[in-house]
């Protein structure tokens, strides 16, 4: 039986190489999944001079209107990756990568980008940033509003000839989600806000800050934690 395919998205001012070190060198997720990495489309100053070129999913100092356009370009960048190397069973996101992965799972967003179904079956988020923290206050909300208006216009045209049956729609994301958060993370509150966008989030905590805690994962408690991450990938919703 083939391993599930997992798309891995890095955080702000980071890159795919760092994510590879997190997922393979620390978490060893390559033991249970075929991992695919993607660099964000925009250059930025790296968070550490030793990691090479930094990349980000939005440009920090842009005005909100411009950020919505760069956000759209980043989402299209991910959709193209899905088209070329997917389909993917799940997605891993760290920090800002967790935010943009979550945003793509919003029905209005992936619908406006031409996807007829949710792009992933499950999502694994590490030290995730909620939308306002990741993209700037109100940027994602305005973007989702524009996507919803576009989707509603297309739906209305279709419904003229084919009235739909009544259906309930939840604003919460329905795919299984596992959230690994640092107890000492400066953005812990934002990570907790991100969990509230999901219908049934599963929560895990480590004792470090805004990082994948390499040393902690060498302990007995850390081994148990990584085993739960791997179990979730193999059977989403049952970690």
Regions found by a protein language model. Give the residues of each.
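Active-site nucleophile loop of the alpha/beta-hydrolase fold
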Residues: 40-43, 123-133, 208
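The conserved beta1-alpha1 loop
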Residues: 7-12, 127, 181-182
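Acidic catalytic loop of the alpha/beta-hydrolase fold
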Residues: 131-132, 182-189, 209-211
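Short beta-strand/loop motif that positions the catalytic acidic residue
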Residues: 172-173, 177-181
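Serine-hydrolase catalytic machinery in alpha/beta-hydrolase-like enzymes
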Residues: 3-90, 103
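Catalytic histidine-centered segment of alpha/beta-hydrolase-like enzymes
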Residues: 209-221
């Amino acid at each position: 039986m083939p391993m599930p395919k997992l798309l891995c998205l890095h955080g702000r001012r980071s890159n795919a190489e760092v994510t590879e070190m997190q997922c393979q060198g620390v978490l060893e997720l390559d033991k249970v999944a075929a991992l695919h990495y993607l660099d964000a489309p925009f250059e930025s100053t790296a968070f550490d001079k030793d990691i090479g070129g930094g990349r980000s999913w939005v440009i920090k100092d842009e005005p909100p209107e411009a950020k919505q356009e760069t956000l759209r370009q980043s989402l299209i960048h991910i959709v193209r990756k899905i088209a070329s190397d997917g389909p993917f069973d799940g997605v891993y996101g760290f920090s800002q990568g967790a935010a943009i992965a979550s945003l793509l799972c919003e029905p209005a967003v992936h619908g406006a980008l031409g996807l007829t179904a949710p792009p992933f079956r499950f999502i694994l988020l590490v030290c995730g940033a909620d939308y306002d923290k990741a993209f700037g206050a109100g940027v994602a909300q305005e973007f989702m509003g524009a996507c919803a208006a576009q989707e509603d216009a297309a739906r209305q045209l279709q419904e003229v000839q084919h009235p739909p049956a009544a259906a309930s729609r939840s604003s919460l994301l329905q795919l299984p989600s596992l959230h690994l958060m640092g107890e000492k993370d400066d953005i812990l509150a934002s990570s907790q806000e991100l969990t509230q966008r999901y219908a049934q989030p599963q929560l895990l905590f480590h004792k470090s800050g805004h990082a994948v805690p390499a040393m902690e994962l060498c302990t007995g408690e850390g081994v148990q934690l990584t085993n739960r991450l791997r179990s979730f990938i193999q059977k989403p919703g049952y970690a």
